[in-house]
Amino acid sequence: MKRIWMALLLAVLAAPSFAVIGTVDEVPAATLLLPYFEVDLDSADGVTTLMSINNASATAVLAHVVIWTDLSIHILDFNVYLTGYDVQSINLRDILVDGNLPITASAGQDPTDTISPKGPSSQDINFASCAGQLPYDNPALDATYLDHVQSALTGQASVVFFGGKCSGIDHGDRIARGYITVDAVNNCAQDFPQDIGYFGAGGTGSATNQNVLWGDYFYVNPGQNFAQGETLVHIEADSTLGAGNYTFYHRYVSAANGEDNREGLGNVFAVRYINGGVFSGGSDLLTWRDSKYPELPFSCALAFPSHFPLGQEQVVVFDEEENYEVPEGCQISPCPPTEGIVPFPWEAQRTEVGSSELPTTFSFGWMFLNLNFSNGGLPQFDPLMQNWVSVVMDADGRFSVGFDAIQLGNVTDGDVTNNPTIDVF
């Protein structure tokens, strides 16, 4: 009987999940996005971020992981080998503090099947390109490289790799901030999405169109005794997506032809907030945004590149009796320092509801967020801008919750009229 149930389970897993391109639903995908992370570099009791990368298919697969700063400058990449139905858990503190990368290996680097053992129904094959790379010899990041990574993710100058330039925002603390992408690939790639050959139409580059990856993540703060979790953003590939589509990696692909084939994210959202009562810690919005430019390291004297901070089309805050407040926002680029609120200025951030960045006098309700913004990037899709929004609510030392915002609009079809606002008086 056990074998019968296992056969039925595997049959279900082998069947393709129902998915609609341009909705960013929670189904196996070719790219995963951890929209925001935090890691306290000095305290083991401080905040850290955990994530998992999982394989939904029986076929072995390679995943290429890229760590980006909160201004979308890549600072580290590595590969993870997954046997069929495999799971790889990662604590970002292990990487960013200790310099240790996940230990995995394909069959050619693991002939005794002790590093990445396979199950009875899982494929385990050799990726010859991984020879000399996998498994990593930890600590894989030496002191020089680790200093570069930590400096980049805390807004400090990186002398060795970036010539003394900066690549992130200096928040005045030792919390590493940024985001992570994970792509299905067909070799142990050592390049980034903007490199020639990383993408090819129909999944013919290093990155493939295998919609088999899924995962989740947790923010854990031992010192404050709480954790929140959510699924990663699952970004599907579809070979029919091209030049007329605002794809996820559109700002990077050659000649802006959409050859990454990845669906775009949302531009308009609805999200609940609680700013009082038992949730004494309030609500924070965690956002990822696409500046629509391939970012480069910049002079630390500038604080950030010229087209930041990022503004938005409209923010409307409702209470539970449909009363509303409309914080004045910024609609030109770059946002003048005195031009209304700028709650989501960077590519990845945490914003406290009720703070000066996102003010409201209400305690409970929901927010309408139209995060379209014209800044000169990807002019063929102006004013569309893709984003992701989540919310975390907590009561310090007692309990916490986290969940994704509701997506009201999506940029994939490239329809520039997709710019809804709420009539306010």
Q: What residue ranges belong to the model's regions?
A:
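Asparagine-centered strand-capping/turn motif at beta-strand->loop junctions
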Residues: 52-59, 69, 304
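Sec-dependent signal peptide recognition
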Residues: 2-10
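Short beta-strand and strand-turn-strand segments in soluble, beta-rich domains
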Residues: 66-78
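A structural motif detector for short, solvent-exposed N-terminal "entry" segments of globular domains
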Residues: 20-54
